[in-house]
Structures are given as C-alpha cells and as structure tokens.
C-alpha cells in the first residue's frame, strides 16, 4: 500500500504559526524514497500513533535552532563521556539521533516472547550439534549444513556447560516490514555488540530531554549488567559462593573496547587481556598485584579463531594457550561457548523456524525474512534469474560489507556476484528488497524519515531468558540507504519500551536518577594502555580483525 501524503496533524501543524513546528515536520515524507515504508510515528493518514503523541507534542513546537542545540548537547555528552567506537584505529563518536524509537507495552510483550522462544530453540540446537546430533540423524536439517560451516568447531564437542547454557547473551536483529510486522533479520550468538550504546544513549537522552522522561513510563535499561553478571556467576563450574568472573578483551584497538570496559566496570569484575591470564594443570589463573588468582568464568569478547593458539590460530597473541583444555576439563566456563557461530551462520538462520518446531514443538512467534539459499540448486537458479531484484548477502559478511543490492547494482557488479554465487553457492543467500520501517530523524535542521532496525539483547542465566527492554535501534542516516552500520554512515536512537500503566514493577526512568548514576569518564581509549610498543603491529592488527558485526 502506497503511503499517502500526511494530512491531519502534519497539515494542521503547517497551518499554524509558520515560525515554529511547521518547519520541523512541514516537509516530512515528501520524498518518494520512503513512500512504501511503515512509518513508526505517523500512520498512512498522517495521524500520530499513540506511543508517539507525547514526543510529537514536545518536538512540534521546536524550531531548527532548538533541534540543533539539543543535537549538539547529545554530541557533546557522548564526547565528554568517551562514548566512541574504533574504526581503522580511529576513535569516533557514535551518532545519537534526538528522536527516540518507541515500542508500546503490548507490542514489546509479543517481541519478548518471540525472542525468548528463538533463544531457547537455538540453545537446544547448539547442545544437540555438539552432543548427540539428533536433528541431523532425523534428517530435519542437512548434515552438510553443519559440517560446511566454518564456525562448527570439533574442539567444542564434549565441552558441556555446567548449567547447560551456551548462549549467555544473544543479539537478535529485527526489522519491521511495510505492513508493520517485525521479522528476524539475523541472529548473533557469539559476541553481540552494542549494548553499551543502549545504556549510554538512555543516560544521555535523559540529560537532554528530562521533561520527556517525566511524562512517559519508559522501562529502564540500566540493570543489564546485573542480569549479565548473574548469568555468568550461575554458569560457574565451582560450588563457590563468589566465583571469579573476568571480561576478556582483545585490547584497546578493538572497535568495541569501550563496551568491554564499561561492562567490566558495571559488573565489578576485572577487564583482562590474554597476557593477563595463563593456564596450569588445566586451570586458568589471572596475574594480579597480589599474586595469581584462579578464574572460574571468562566473558570473552575474542573470536574463536584467536582464543587459544594451541587449538586455533597458532599466531594469535590475543588468547590464552590451554584455554580450551581447561574448559573441557570443566575448570573454567567460556561465555559465550566455543562454536556458537554454527548457530548464527546466515544460512543456518534459514532453518531456525524448523528448529523451533523440532525442539520446542511450537510455531515460530517471529517470522524470518524470506530467504533463498544459493546452495540449493533450484533456489540458486531462481536467485540468478531474479538477481536484479534481490539483495545478495555473503553468509560470512558483517558490518554491511559485501552486500549487493540488485536494483541498485551495475551490470558489472551483478555479473561479478553471479559468478561468486556459481563458484561458492554455500557462501551466499538472497532476500527480497525489504522495506524497513522509518522513524523521524534530524537531518540538516529538520525531521525526515530514515530506515531503522532493532537489536534486542537477551540474557540466559539458566533459569530464564531475560530480554533487555528495548535494545539498540540503528538508523541509516543517508537518504534511501538501508545500511545502518556505523562504519557506513549509520547512527543510533534511544529505544523506549513503555511500561503498562497497571504495572508497578516496571519502574520509571527519572532524569534525576540517571544524572546521579552517570559513569565516571573512562581512560582515553586513544592512549595505548596495553603496554605494547607503537611499532608492535601484530596485536593491533589482530584486534582490528575482530570488528564486530554491529559496526
């Protein structure tokens, strides 16, 4: 359904005082680029949707200078607090847009259930694949789907987590289609990045828009670290009341180092690099100023390939020799588990609805995006026949790199990707050109629609799957672009989940509380605190090789 021009509130706004809100929403969605998209603030008749009425009322009276002042305040707060991401060794502030994305309580309940269902099914799948492999024996999914996945590690076979949890943290990427239905775009089960921006976006927004938080029942996000710490402690193999937990980071050159540092500080645990740990007699120890200390749980933000030079890449200087054997002996827990990538491979993604039915005996609550699998002969031929209308994605791609948008590609680009698909069909999938939803976004002094996605974060502590209310909304700031990654011009939005009015348990987020709990400034991430000499490029290169899919 083609969206009509926006009358009602918007036209009424245009008829009122020409010096105020008309200039902010007056030209909203006059471009044909977003004509088919589902706009989250306005319906097809231009009526402000219920969850956004308060935000519209706050923003409509603003003029361009007021919007700029607030946007500048957001930017300064990010810089002052050291909220950056690293791209090619350069620290950059992560753009935060001033218009939040809002999700109603009933809608969030549906999403929460769907995410929980998906995580439970993937947990069953990983336990099965590294155990009895019943799903393969029953012929539910092809055996070669697993054996051909580069993230299936035989080193992980036989490593049984003490409390049965392999996916301690999951990031489930969602989009909203032209009908307004949420769909799963991708699963992230290894080291999903971006939760630090969820928390810092909220803190910063509360400082700049305190009146909005006073009039909306926005569910809190600042207790994520406590849920993560509980999950990590619950996973410990020891019976000690206070297991030693550490966060293992590749180092200061990694794009997500800010997040590693923030989470370690909020959980009250040590942030360590591989050189801070060593193994002896299948035990893991941490070097401290008071001597060595045994480690029980490692929340590692290092890719499998770099984790243990005795098992994976022998040239890794980021990991710890002997770590896998210590995990196999049951003396340390690695979070997330080795080999989880066999559950978030983009080709494996297409079989998750089947896994839900097989393991849980339930119908999927969240649909996938329709996907064609190039490794299947008939689907590959369909892809090649329709290549000009599809989006071609490399199975191992991340950060938006390697994606070819058929309708926008040149003949040479289409010919090149067609040949790649023929040469290595296992490495490619294809999806229709999805119409992502849009949210008003500040662009050059006014508000205009821009495409968004959503990454909610789920934490599994062995007793329940808890989903952080909201998640990271990423926005494609370039007009017409569907690539939301920060490395390609994307930004973010604060994501508000509104609490049910009858709920006393879900506490409101007050601006005063946020100001009191602002974090202390981190050390300058551009300062080399690693102890490596500037000419020692190997650690820096390996850290940068692990740029998270979030970026």
UniProtKB/Swiss-Prot annotation:
Signal peptide: none
Biased amino acid composition, Basic and acidic residues: 12-22
Protein name in UniProt: Uncharacterized protein Mb2434c
Family: To Synechocystis PCC 6803 sll0335 and to M.tuberculosis Rv2567.
Organism: Mycobacterium bovis (strain ATCC BAA-935 / AF2122/97)
Biased composition (Low complexity): 537-551
Bias type Polar residues, positions: 1-11
Xref: PANTHER family: BLR5612 PROTEIN (PTHR34595), SLL1039 PROTEIN (PTHR34595:SF7)
Stretches for region Disordered: 1-22, 523-551
């Amino acid at each position: 359904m083609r969206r009509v021009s926006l009358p009602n509130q918007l036209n009424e706004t245009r008829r009122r005082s020409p010096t105020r809100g008309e200039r902010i929403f007056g030209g909203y969605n006059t471009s044909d680029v977003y004509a088919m998209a589902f706009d989250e603030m306005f319906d097809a008749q231009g009526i402000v949707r219920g969850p956004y009425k308060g935000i519209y009322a706050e923003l409509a009276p603003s003029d361009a200078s007021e919007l700029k002042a607030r946007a500048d305040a957001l930017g300064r707060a990010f810089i002052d607090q050291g909220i950056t991401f690293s791209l090619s060794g350069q620290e950059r502030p992560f753009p935060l847009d001033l218009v939040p994305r809002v999700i109603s309580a009933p809608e969030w309940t549906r999403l929460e259930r769907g995410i929980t269902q998906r995580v439970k099914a993937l947990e069953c799948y990983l336990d099965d694949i590294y155990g009895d492999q019943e799903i393969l024996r029953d012929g539910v999914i092809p055996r070669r789907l697993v054996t051909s996945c580069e993230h299936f590690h035989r080193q992980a076979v036989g490593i049984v987590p003490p409390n049965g949890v392999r996916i301690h943290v999951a990031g489930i990427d969602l989009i909203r289609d032209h009908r307004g239905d949420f769909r799963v775009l991708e699963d992230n089960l290894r080291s999903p990045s971006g939760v630090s921006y969820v928390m810092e976006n909220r803190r910063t927004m509360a400082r700049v828009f305190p009146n909005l938080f006073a009039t909306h029942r926005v569910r809190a996000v600042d207790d994520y670290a406590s849920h993560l710490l509980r999950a990590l402690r619950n996973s410990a193999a020891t019976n000690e009341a206070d297991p030693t937990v550490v966060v293992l980071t590749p180092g200061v050159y990694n794009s997500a180092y800010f997040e590693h540092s923030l989470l370690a500080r909020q959980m009250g645990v040590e942030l360590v690099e591989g050189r801070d740990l060593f193994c002896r007699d299948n035990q893991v120890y941490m070097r401290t100023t008071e001597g060595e200390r045994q480690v029980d749980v490692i929340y590692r933000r290092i890719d499998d390939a770099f984790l243990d030079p005795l098992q994976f890449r022998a040239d890794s200087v980021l990991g710890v020799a002997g770590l896998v054997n210590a995990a196999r002996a049951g003396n340390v827990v690695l979070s997330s588990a080795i080999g989880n990538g066999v559950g978030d491979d983009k080709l494996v993604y297409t079989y998750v609805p089947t896994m839900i039915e097989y393991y849980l005996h339930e119908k999927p609550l969240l649909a996938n995006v329709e996907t064609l699998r190039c490794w299947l002969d008939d689907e590959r031929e369909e892809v090649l026949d329709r290549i000009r209308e599809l989006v071609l994605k490399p199975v191992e791609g991340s950060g938006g790199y390697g994606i070819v948008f058929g309708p926008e590609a040149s003949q040479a680009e289409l010919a090149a990707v067609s040949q790649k698909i023929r040469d290595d069909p296992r490495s490619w999938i294809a999806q229709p050109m999805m119409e992502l939803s849009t949210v008003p976004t500040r662009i050059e002094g006014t508000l205009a629609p821009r495409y968004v996605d959503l990454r909610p974060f789920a934490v599994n502590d062995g007793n329940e799957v808890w989903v952080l209310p909201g998640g990271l909304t990423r926005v494609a700031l370039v007009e017409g672009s569907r690539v939301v990654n920060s490395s390609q011009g994307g930004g973010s939005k604060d994501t508000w989940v509104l609490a049910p009015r009858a709920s006393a348990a879900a506490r409101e987020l007050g601006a005063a509380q946020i100001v009191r709990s602002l974090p202390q400034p981190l050390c300058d991430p551009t300062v080399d605190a690693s102890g490596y000499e500037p000419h020692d490029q190997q650690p820096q290169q390996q850290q940068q090789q692990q740029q998270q899919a979030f970026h």
